[in-house]
Amino acid sequence: MHSKRYSLTEGSIWKAMLFFAFPVFLGNVFQQLYNTFDAWCVGNYIGDDALAAVSSSGSLIFMMVSFFNGVAMGAGVVIARSFGAKQYDTMNKAIHTAIAFGLVTGVMLTVAGVALTPTILRWMGTPAEVLPQSIAYFRYYFCGAIFTVMYNIFVGILHAVGDSKHPLYYLIFSAFVNIVLDMLFVAVLGFGVGSAAIATTISQGVSALLCLLHLVRVDAPYRVSIRKIRLDKTSLVEIIRYGLPSGVQNSVIALANVVVQANINSFGKAAMAGCGSYSKLEGFAFLPVTCFTQALSTFVGQNLGAHRHDRVKKGVGFGIACSCIMAELIGVLSYLFAPQLISLFSDSQESIAFGTQHMRTICLFYCLLAFSHCIAGIMRGAGKATVPMFTMLACWCLFRVTYISVAVKLVNQLTTVSWAYPITWTLSSIIFLIYFLKADWIHNFDRDFKQA
């Protein structure tokens, strides 16, 4: 059995955390590499219009996918809790319910994404000269949305039981597939911007299939049986209970970021290309944030399920410190080398200037972003998903949109838009710190667990 090997409830805390987080970090590196390679490839082989079309994709894709990924987080909480408590029957039902739910919602997302892409892009104020290529890219991308949803479901299952290595192997292989197909479709065959999305769709399908094959074949309590894939009412209620707040949070925040992107679009395609190039680089800055957030959520869920309160208290401090220090180090390096980094995607001096300005306004505040995400991950692992939901909705959505709506009218500059991120990260960090220090979230988990 592999269950003991992947348990985070025993042994050295820092080793358990790092051994889980490091493969997640490497996996995210490769995922970000092939996302970035799309932008690099179309920017260098097609041109700035294509780069603008692809680079503005982040906020729209995140808006469409984030709700379903948030609900998948709920499945991870239920699975990690049951795994830590060694309640394998409950865990097994949750796993198969999560897969069934992912299949249903993945189809819904694919249909909605293909149908709504033109409307959303026009609402975002996408310039007319970029719009056709943007529509082509997004429609091809959303044709494979079901693969994205299922991959996240499978990875969520593996992470919940402490296995972060196998997703890494599959992501490395799919990243290689994506890069090869990008070069073939765009650079060699000259198929256009849509082919970059097709390459991404194929690679996501490959990674989802590899994860499924592993789950079907693994000799462990979390083994998947195709015949058992169905919606179990009790498991679904638990998954939605923990996942719906994260899904709503992700979607509404993504909508707020679409508003930010729409304001960036108003400065023209050079601003779109420059800021879009930054958004690809920003993904690398988020790597320590995302890997430690996932590690903390799984660590807290497993150890609270096993009633290891002492490990929880020690582990969260270590995880937060590592994430914040690494994020800020990346932020400082990003500030120092901003022009050189942006120029990797475009040789347009105007685009480089916009991207550099945007990056340098934001990047020194990455430690606050890391802190907010870590506390959110801890609260999700503790079954308190409504805490990050309300905090982030208030700070990253309502306040961010209000700030943008007012500030841009007063000072119509790109830096005004850029400041929306540091200001709202600061606000959420203050609220999270107060809750983290004052609330009895550890023992509340025990009471909720007994009721479940």
Give each language-model segment a name.
Residues 36-40, 111, 153-157, 179-184, ...:
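Alpha-helical transmembrane segments of multipass membrane proteins
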